[in-house]
Amino acid sequence: MKFPGGLNIQAMMKQAQQLQEKMAQEMEEMRVEASAGGGVVNVTMKGDHEIISLKIDPEIVKENDIEMLQDMIVAAINEGNRKVNEAMKSKLGSMLPPGLGNLF
């Protein structure tokens, strides 16, 4: 369906769907790493926020400070989520026409 001025909605919808599929594929392949406590807790996440690795320095476990360990795990996961969100914004912004990347 074409509108005055040559605007083709079907072509735009198809392009948007292709963009969405490309973005989903890139997010699936993306990996981000985050840490907390100076590297005591390390997390690796996929672009869809799935945690694929969580590593804890054994020395922190020996200290029996479970509350501190829990806080570091939460901090590492939150940092990973922040990095994924930043990467998504960056990738999406580079895929959109000039001027539209700032919408997100």
Q: What do these predicted regions represent?
A:
Residues 35-55:
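N-terminal intrinsically disordered, cationic/polar leader segments
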Residues 8, 65-72:
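Conserved acidic
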Residues 60-61, 70-71, 87:
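Short, charged/polar low-complexity linear motifs in solvent-exposed/disordered segments
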Residues 31, 38, 58-60:
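Short, well-ordered turn and helix-capping elements at secondary-structure junctions
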Residues 72, 76-84:
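Stable alpha-helical structural segments in soluble proteins, enriched in small hydrophobic residues
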Residues 1-33, 83-104:
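Long amphipathic alpha-helical segments used for membrane anchoring, targeting, substrate engagement
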Residues 54-66:
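A short interface-forming secondary-structure element
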Residues 16, 49, 73:
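Residue-level signature of catalytic and energy-coupling elements of molecular machines
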